[in-house]
Regions:
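Nucleotide-activated donor-binding/catalytic signature segment of Leloir-type glycosyltransferases, i.e.
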Residues: 232-255
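Short alpha-helical donor nucleotide-sugar binding micro-motif in glycosyltransferases
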Residues: 258-264
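Donor nucleotide-sugar binding/catalytic pocket of nucleotide-sugar-dependent glycosyltransferases
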Residues: 123-178
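Short hydrophobic beta-strand element within catalytic cores of glycosyltransferases
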Residues: 289-292
Length: 385
């Protein structure tokens, strides 16, 4: 099949996802993109800008069987701006995130127009794909709350139709070579996330202070992209843990990033927001033992091993790290490491890409709003069962 993929924010996880799928797919792909910056402006103009790219591709002979777009594009607008050859294609919207439940520091900062654009895009799609069941459920619940607040014509009844057309299709990761046995030394702790408040880095550093006070030796790698408004705790932590730090900051070289993951023992998350957690999946595939708060998408993805979780506070995280340190290189440690690798193997592209290829092939154009798209009854959600 010939697939037209539109990625209005072509950077970070959005780029990595599409690159991984297309490399492992049996379909033929045309990928049209816009740079991954200024997300609000991208959401405003993406339909117009990409429709012009599409017309140019059609002029060069482009023809497609399916349309695949991300949540950063208003599909309803795009259908209106494109010729029938594209406007009438069966279409999937993939939700990496959404603008109703994506975190903001202050509730007054949320522009509900972008969330409503997500709604219109979903209505225009034949299927909605989410990276986790947690994401699907929280989005649809928030959408229903939003629509019931409208003064009239809220169209709340359409939310149940969207749920029927929603599938869980987690992002894939590359297969990981055997890293061999662990080298000697202190416990190696990894934290990899955006350096923003919704990842709660302060919880990590408060927990590490407690670990240090208990006399547990550790090495530390703190990775991730930083922005203009950097939480103050990073500068404080860099000074406090300067003797323990091995890696600090954003790593744009994939080989170096993989090497850091391969030598780490624990992958710690302190997130208060996470729709999937690709960094955790990659670290687990490398043999890191996940240390996760018992919330968000994590229980859905890693709940088969209770010892991967802590209660969510800095004290509970410190307790979990110290408990794992006492098990370093024991039989239980090796069991946990093997379980992490096993659970993450569900997300290998070699497994997920064929399943998503199949699902895309079974997407049909709905003729009437509210009519469920026909399919084969199997989805990429099976990969996480």
């Amino acid at each position: 099949m010939r697939i037209l993929a539109l990625n209005p924010y072509h950077s970070g996880s959005h780029l990595t996802f599409l690159d991984g799928w297309t490399k492992n797919s049996r379909h033929e792909w045309t990928v049209l993109t816009l740079p991954g910056r200024r997300w609000k402006w991208r959401m405003r103009h993406a339909a117009l800008s990409l429709s012009r790219q599409i017309r140019a591709e059609i002029g060069r002979g482009g023809r497609w069987d399916r349309l695949w777009v991300t949540d950063m594009l208003n599909l309803a607008e795009l259908r209106g701006l494109c010729p029938p050859a594209v406007a009438d294609l069966p279409a999937v919207v993939y939700f990496h995130e959404n603008q109703l439940t994506y975190p903001v520091r202050n509730a007054t900062e949320r522009d509900l127009h972008f969330g409503y654009s997500n709604f219109l895009s979903a209505i225009a799609a034949d299927q909605l794909w989410f990276n986790s069941a947690f994401h699907r459920d929280t989005f649809l619940e928030a959408l229903l709350r939003l629509l019931t607040r409208m003064p009239d014509y809220g169209h709340e009844s359409l939310v149940s139709d969207l749920r029927l057309r929603s599938l869980v299709c987690p992002p894939g990761i590359d297969t990981w070579p055997d890293t061999g046995s662990r080298s000697a030394g202190a416990l190696r702790i990894l934290w990899a996330a955006r350096w923003e408040h919704d990842k709660d880095p302060d919880c990590l550093f408060r927990a590490l202070e407690r670990v240090q006070q208990r006399g547990v030796a550790f090495r530390l790698s703190v990775l991730g992209q930083s922005f203009a408004e950097l939480p103050e705790c990073f500068d404080t932590a860099r000074r406090r843990f300067r003797e323990q730090i091995d890696d600090w900051g954003f790593v744009d070289d994939r080989d170096r990033y993989h090497a850091i993951l391969a030598r780490a023992d624990l992958m710690v998350s302190t997130a208060v927001h996470e729709f999937f957690g690709i960094a955790v999946a990659e670290a687990a595939a490398a043999g890191c033992i996940p240390v996760l708060p018992e919330r968000l998408s994590y229980p859905e993805l890693y709940g088969a091993e209770p010892d991967f979780f802590y209660g969510g506070t800095a004290t509970e995280l410190a307790d979990r790290i110290c408990a794992l340190d006492s098990q370093l290189q024991t039989a239980r440690w090796l069991e946990l490491q093997a379980k992490a690798i096993e659970l993450s193997s569900r997300f290998h592209w070699t497994r997920l890409a064929p399943m998503m290829d199949d699902q895309l092939q079974h997407v049909d154009r709905r003729r009437v709003l509210g009519e469920r798209a026909m399919g084969n009854g199997h989805t990429a959600e099976d990969a996480t069962d």
